[in-house]
Amino acid sequence: KNILNPEAVGDALERAVNLANVQSTDVALAVPTSMVITKIIEMDADMNDDEREIQIRDDAEQYIPFPLDEASLDFEVLPDRLANPNRVNVLLVATRIENVEARAEALELGGLTPKIADVESFAIENAFKVFSDTLPMGVNTVGILDIGHTMTTLSVMQNNKVIYTREQVFGGKQLTQEIQNRYGLSFEEAGRAKKSRTLPDDYDIEVLEPFLEAVVQQAARSLQFFFSSSQFNEIDHILLAGGNANIPGLAKLLQQKLGYRVTIANPFLQMGFSPQIDIKKIENDASSLMVACGLALRSFD
């Protein structure tokens, strides 16, 4: 998820903003969870924010495995009640400055103004909260399986909080490459054919089904990592997210193979829409917009 060509990303963003006729240029960005360090530390309750920051920076070597002058960090006092009323839990979040600056640079090249830097897992948590009550009664532990272009991320939610995140290098790019190789297409042509579902008759059996089986294996492996590193041995529900969540047959196959109910995430399920919004397009893309939705909701914090 590194930005290798900020100019190209900025150009694409500028064209997207112009096409969408966006009124505000203020933006919230998210850094991948794998690039971020989070720690919960206990501090005195009567400290103000300036005092907390000084204390955190003084103790930074305990928490951050790279030089402080290379770190972008923030903190927030959590509402947790501790046994000692004179102490509070503080969430510390840190990443390398370059991880924020690379994204900010691309946004600025696209004519946008970065205002907030968040973390992908926090954005997903934010988005999940607005539609979690649409899940069946008794669902408390939910796995959000986000299958992107090159990365698949499992985020496990417990009572509307992210308690586990695991990323692995696997995504829809593999399917596009298989289409490209089998049918002699360019990568761009293969991507368009995959999206429009205009492929030869043998596509489902020869290309799609092996890819779906690979997704199941990746999902099962991620769940096993979660179970082996926590006190949990099962989850209640799986939500499919990401640009590949709507691949025909994927949700059904995951449900059959993993033994959990699987549905496709839609963070906009309970939202109203402006008349000029193409609702059908939003519904088609909803599963891939979890992070974007969570970031947009920051404006209501």
Where are these regions (language model features)?
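Phosphate-interacting basic helix/loop segments used at nucleotide- and nucleic-acid interfaces
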Residues: 7-21, 134-140, 221-225
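Active-site neighborhood for divalent-cation/phosphate handling
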Residues: 26, 30-132, 237, 267-273, ...
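Terminal alpha-helical anchor/extension segments at protein ends
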Residues: 106, 174-176, 212, 251, ...
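Adenine-nucleotide phosphate-binding core of ATP-dependent small-molecule kinases
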Residues: 121, 169, 177, 181-182, ...
